[in-house]
Amino acid sequence: LVNMAFDDQVALAIAQSGGLPPLLALAREGTAGQKVRAAAALRNLAYTEQIASEIAALGVGPLVALVKSGSAHAKEQAAGCLGNLALVTRNRSAIQMAGGYEALSQLVMEGNQGQRDVAQSALKILAHADEVACVVVKG
């Protein structure tokens, strides 16, 4: 699914056939390897605006949780997914409300180079959200 999700038609077929809830469930409750692959698939699926909106509507909590406490690879994939979700303006509030800003900020401070790069990119996108601007100002 990870590689297939790069094709827009296949990505839409995955979403329309009910593939998103099981991927979010795996991101939340799967084995370490399943969490990485689920986050990677969701990251690639989130390039499509319609799918990104659906993922955000289903809940970004599992992705934020992976950024906070997943394996090294899961953290990077989940951070990338949050960044892709944030490309859709209306998703930014959901990410902020789920603790995404704090989780990504922590990853920038404590992650490896790849994690830091992905988290910084996601934060740059999130910085355009009023909700995040309020958090930054409050410190």
Predicted features and spans:
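Alpha-helical solenoid repeat architecture
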Residues: 1-7, 25, 36-48, 76-89, ...
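Buried hydrophobic core positions in alpha-solenoid tandem helical repeats
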Residues: 22-24, 62-64, 103-105
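Alpha-solenoid helical repeat architecture
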Residues: 27-30, 67-70, 108-111
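Detector for intrinsically disordered, low-structure N-terminal pre-sequences
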Residues: 1, 9, 59, 63-66, ...
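Short, hydrophobic/charged alpha-helical patches characteristic of ARM/HEAT alpha-solenoid repeats
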Residues: 10-17, 33-35, 50-58, 73-75, ...
